[in-house]
Design a protein with these regions (language model features):
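Short, small-residue-biased leader/transition segments that mark boundaries at the very start
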Residues: 3-7
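A short, charged/proline- and glycine-enriched loop
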Residues: 48-56
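Polyanion-binding loop/helix "lid" in catalytic or ligand-binding cores
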Residues: 169, 214-262
Length: 428
């Protein structure tokens, strides 16, 4: 039941996110292609680090202020991955992370103002905020996740790989999923309160008061000491996602060294000092290891990206033509049935054209990109898919008309892809 609830809530979060910012997310994966030359692939770090080295995932919860300085003692003994909202706090304490990580397309620029950030190894989802990459100009950019067929093929052609890393909707969860993918057998969490510890929401935030508003409903959960603590519904979903990750990976030791915040089942509670003393013993030149991974698209990278953008543009232009043709045949079929023109041969040919179109669209390398950019059209179609008519002819008419509407929605929506491609070409 716990697993089912996690899947359901994760799906709800993904769906709501796509409806709100799906187009923005999809277009970011195009804009960010200009950062591919000389980047690294996160997949190249899989099973790369020594087995005794733990990963420390640093989030921005209020308890981070308790132990952030201790991260200096873990330098060279653990891989420190700092989530974007914790970067300024961590680096203000003189801690140089091994990696920072960012995911969200709309992450605010104020999270990336730390001095020296450009020198830190910068983990980015393919759909990360383009404005952040433009502002920070990371010297060591590492793309770690994509669901884009184009990106995956490009990394494969370059002798590496790149797939989707996702665990439930927060940057810290992505960082944990990445640590699992990289093969770490011990994951230490700090700043992962997921609750209003000490009447605060974030490590660098102000105290909450009666006028504080939240972007989701609130509820109470047990903290690590057994007391009730206030949290938010989305935080509660993240708590369950962490529990689910730990439950599904019994061979990995999940340590909650937050020293406060919500209780997370299937994790071990200890202080960060205890975790460092017990599990961060051997010293390695971590920076040298990270730097040793080769850069990708270092030779003629800009030209390669331009070629890929041109291919994508041609594919989208063909899609627009074919989607409009699909809408026309759907309208034709609906018209025939509405006027009682039951020509089975003509309808059979129309259905075959629709089948071929749907299969071609599903096989497009850009399919997932298109679904994001046209998420509203897809959502509108899916919300009516089960509103069936009792009469079979009326039901067929409904399906044809809804399909035509979807095809037109896709054809109209992908015009933004072409605009973004053209803008990206200018900026290379």
């Amino acid at each position: 039941r716990q697993r089912q609830m996690c899947i359901r809530d994760s799906y709800r979060i993904q769906t709501n996110t796509l409806i709100k910012v799906g187009k923005q997310i999809g277009l970011a994966s195009i804009s960010n292609m200009r950062f591919l030359p000389n980047c690294r692939s996160g997949a190249d770090y899989k099973d790369y680090f020594p087995e005794d080295v733990p990963a420390i995932i640093v989030a921005a919860g209020p308890s981070l202020q308790k132990n952030v300085d201790l991260l200096k003692k873990a330098k060279g003994k653990a891989i420190t991955i700092v989530v974007d909202s914790a970067i300024n706090t961590v680096m203000a304490h003189g801690v140089m992370p091994d990696f920072v990580i960012t995911v969200d397309t709309n992450k605010e620029l104020k999270n990336f103002t730390a001095e020296g950030l450009a020198d830190v190894f910068f983990l980015a989802d393919a759909t990360a905020n383009t404005a952040v990459l433009d502002m920070v100009k990371p010297k060591n950019l590492v793309f770690y996740s994509t669901d884009s067929g184009t990106w995956s093929r490009m990394f494969s052609d370059a002798g590496s790989s790149l797939g989707e890393i996702f665990a439930g909707g927060s940057v810290a969860l992505d960082a944990m999923a990445l640590a699992i993918d990289w093969g770490f057998k011990r994951i230490i969490m700090i700043g992962q309160d997921l609750a209003m510890t000490g009447n605060k929401q974030y490590a660098d935030g102000e105290n909450l008061n009666q006028n504080t508003s939240f972007n989701s409903p609130t509820l109470y959960v047990k903290d690590i000491y057994g007391n009730d603590v206030l949290t938010k519904k989305d935080y509660y979903t993240f708590i369950r996602s962490i529990e689910d990750l730990a439950y599904r990976n019994p061979d990995i030791d999940f340590i909650d060294a937050t020293e406060g915040g919500a209780l997370k089942r299937h994790t071990r509670i200890m202080t960060l000092q205890q975790a460092i003393d017990q599990y961060c013993k051997n010293v390695y030149n971590i920076t040298e290891m990270i730097e040793a991974i080769p850069r990708r698209f270092a030779t003629n990278g800009n030209e390669l990206v331009k070629q890929e953008l041109q291919k994508m543009k041609e594919n989208i232009e063909l899609l627009i033509t074919r989607m409009r043709e699909g809408a026309e045949v759907c309208d034709k079929a609906a018209y025939m049935l509405e006027h009682k023109q039951y020509d089975k041969d003509k309808l059979r040919k129309i259905n075959e054209k629709i089948r071929i179109l749907d299969e071609w669209y599903a096989d497009m390398e850009e399919h997932k990109l298109i679904k994001k950019v046209t998420c509203q059209a897809n959502h509108d179609y899916e919300t009516t898919i089960y509103l069936t008519e009792k009469d079979s002819v009326a039901e067929s008419i409904r399906i044809y008309k809804n399909s035509a509407k979807l095809y037109i929605g896709i054809a109209d929506g992908v015009a933004d892809i072409i605009k973004t491609i053209e803008q990206c070409e200018k900026e290379i």
